[in-house]
Amino acid sequence: GTRRRGGPDRFAELRQWTPKTRLGRMVLDGEIMTYQQALATGLPIREVEIIDALIPNLEEDVLAVNMIQRMTDSGRRVRFNVLCVVGNHDGYVGLAICKGKEVASTIQKAITKAKLDLIPVMRGNGSWESGQGPGKSVPIKVTGRSGSTRVTLMPAPAGKGLVIGDTGRRVLNKAGVTDVWSSTAGQTRTTINFAQATFNALKQLNRTRIGDQDKLKLHITRGEVGA
């Protein structure tokens, strides 16, 4: 399920935080106030407290908990595979998978890893069915792959909603994408591959070169819009 982070507890935690990296110290000293500024430094983000300080409204969603049993010489060994997505519903999303012996600690590990793998999301209005103005769809058609799973996201008009399977919907929802058409190919029943292919499509958008004129025409934004 979804959980929201924030509130007074978060600030209490941050007050007790002793940063180990240069970027962490800059955040704690108030030199860096936004995630965009943190990315612009070019410094690696290695401390999860940096994310908690700069994007306090992140929510997490555990997409899958799979039990893996193996027989060893000393008996049956049980481990868990946890897939987790985090996002602020407004242009930032992260996805991670972790393995561990206990469910609770593995979920926590996956949440931390997803926060450290956070990406800005490119959104816009690329649908010919849409009127002029900003939109929260994908600006262009884009495909992501994971294993044999392929997920293609296509611009949809405002109000269309997320026309995609439940796993993809949960990833896009956390990213702040509200309208999308999609098509899928390959093994689409595996939650992990479907989620990773959807996330990889959003990553692919960031690698796509779009001219300044098209950016204006498609009302493209990257990261948080605040609306």
Give names to the regions the model predicted:
Residues G1-A227:
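Ribosome-associated RNA-binding proteins
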